[in-house]
Each structure stands twice: as structure tokens, then as C-alpha cells.
Regions:
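Divalent-metal coordination cores built from histidine and acidic residues
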Residues: 1-94
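Active-site core of metal-dependent hydrolases
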Residues: 69-139
Length: 140
């Protein structure tokens, strides 16, 4: 599973296109996560801005397995329309959503999970790691 977050932050969807085209010349069966947060936070400057509208075409492509790690967890927890719209686009296509919720537990974690975030690889404490399976979320 490839998450082309960095190249898409710099080059936009053209970076995703490049990665997918380059992988066609390998023996690997590469699946991709469409980056969910471009830029990663509203405080960053990047070479592209990918909003829900811009996600509608690439999320339907063969080889796009889901939405890449949703790093703007405060936006999800606080129900920011721009973030929820991205989640809706992915779910309408039957795609999974990868998580990125460092430090969130309890009610905040429940809110994050309610948005149907499927997994989280950011656990750094025993509490965080034990909370996720209890609410049906994988720690990967």
C-alpha cells in the first residue's frame, strides 16, 4: 500500500499520476491511498490543495484502495465541513479511510471513529493502543 502524500503535497494529482504510471513498469501490484490532507494542515503551504471536489475523480480509479491517513483529526473531531466532505466522497465510493490520530482517546477517539476512520497507526501510549480495539478500530 503506497501513500503518495508527499509527492501529492508538492505536485498535486499530477504527482499521483506519475507514481501510478511509474509502478505500471514494475512486477509489483501497487495499491494506493489517495492523500486526504493536502496540505497536511491549514498552517502549511504546499504545491497543491486537494479538496473533496478534487478527490471525486481519483478516488474512483482502479488501484486506489482508500483515503490516506486523515491527519487533520481536529477537523474530523470538530466536524469541519471540508474534512467531512472528503470522508463522504470516499465512503460513497466504498473506500476505507486510514487514520492518523496521535494522542486522541476517550470522547475524541469516539468522534474520530464515528467518522468511519478504519485504522490508526499513531499510537504511542498503552492507553491509546488499548482504546482502539475497544471501539472496533485497528492499530496498524
Amino acid at each position: 500500500m503506497a501513500d503518495p502524500h508527499e509527492i501529492v503535497n508538492v505536485c498535486g494529482i499530477a504527482g499521483l499520476d506519475y507514481m501510478m504510471k511509474a509502478a505500471e513498469n514494475t512486477v509489483l501490484d501497487v495499491k494506493y491511498e489517495l492523500p486526504s490532507c493536502v496540505p497536511a494542515t491549514p498552517f502549511e503551504h504546499s504545491g497543491a490543495v486537494i479538496d473533496a471536489e478534487a478527490m471525486k475523480e481519483p478516488i474512483t480509479r482502479e488501484g486506489i484502495a482508500g483515503l490516506g491517513e486523515f491527519m487533520n483529526f481536529p477537523g474530523v473531531i470538530n466536524a469541519a465541513d471540508s474534512d467531512l466532505d472528503k470522508i463522504i466522497v470516499a465512503k460513497q465510493e466504498g473506500k476505507f479511510i486510514d487514520g492518523h490520530g496521535p494522542g486522541i482517546t476517550g470522547k475524541e477517539l469516539n468522534a474520530y471513529a464515528a467518522a468511519r476512520i478504519a485504522a490508526d497507526h499513531e499510537c504511542s501510549t498503552v492507553e491509546e493502543m488499548s482504546d482502539r480495539p475497544e471501539i472496533g478500530r485497528a492499530h496498524v
